[in-house]
């Protein structure tokens, strides 16, 4: 039996750090259930020992040197970190270099990788055609501007070219042909435009047609049948050809005053001949029997007779 205050003292001693170790009921000193054993402290630690008032600061410093670093956890073999973590933390960190987690192509320099960069367009070299190949291709183009695939393959085997090259050649040749057609059509339109036709010089008419269309002088023409003396005079023009044959001159021409004025014209002789040089006369001799001279004289005589016949009715009246 314990005294009345014993249970409280035992409980207080059990929870105090300076209390002796509580032993098991069997008295085995190896099995300790004290707080020091649970927390892992040893008897060498100065903090667990009794208070030493005479030790001073020197004893406290010696005790601190003896105990070393304080461990709050039970001592045991420390587990090494995984190998991947050890390798990650052992490598030095450099801001300019790429992160170890990123691949080599995804650095911080901002340059895209080879896959992200657009591929350069492969430039094909121009195909150089020989004279024989061009001749055969032109012959095939004359036959058909749009050959089918079988004709192109046959032609490609004949000229020793890929079928793709033959197809491209036909496309380019058709484009050239269309351009030539447009140029020809535009040139024809320009030739047919009224501006150019107006600016062209008129073609010379044939000499025979021109001579036939121009009227001759009245005194050079043949004698006028029918005695139209007034019309044969140099001062009067012949009536147009479109007028009827029964056309008569106006009545005022038959008046006595006009008749009297026209009489001196009939009495006038032929104009004096032109005086030509001796060389010109010798080279081009004048023909005395020229019919034009006789026709002029006969016309004047007929005009005089006509005027006299016109004046006779007035005399009888």
Curated annotation (Swiss-Prot):
Motif (Nuclear localization signal): 300-304
Region (Disordered): 44-127
InterPro entries xrefs: HD, Homeobox_CS, Homeodomain-like_sf, OAR_dom, RAX/RAX2
Pfam families in the record: Homeodomain, OAR
KW Chaperone (keyword) present: no
Keyword Lipid metabolism: no
DNA bind region: 122-181
A GO BP annotation: positive regulation of transcription by RNA polymerase II
Motif residue range(s): OAR: 294-307
Family: Belongs to the paired homeobox family. Bicoid subfamily.
Record's function text: Plays a critical role in eye formation by regulating the initial specification of retinal cells and/or their subsequent proliferation.
Name of protein: Retinal homeobox protein Rx2
Source organism of the structure: Gallus gallus (Chicken)
Highest classification ranks of the organism: Eukaryota, Metazoa, Chordata, Craniata, Vertebrata
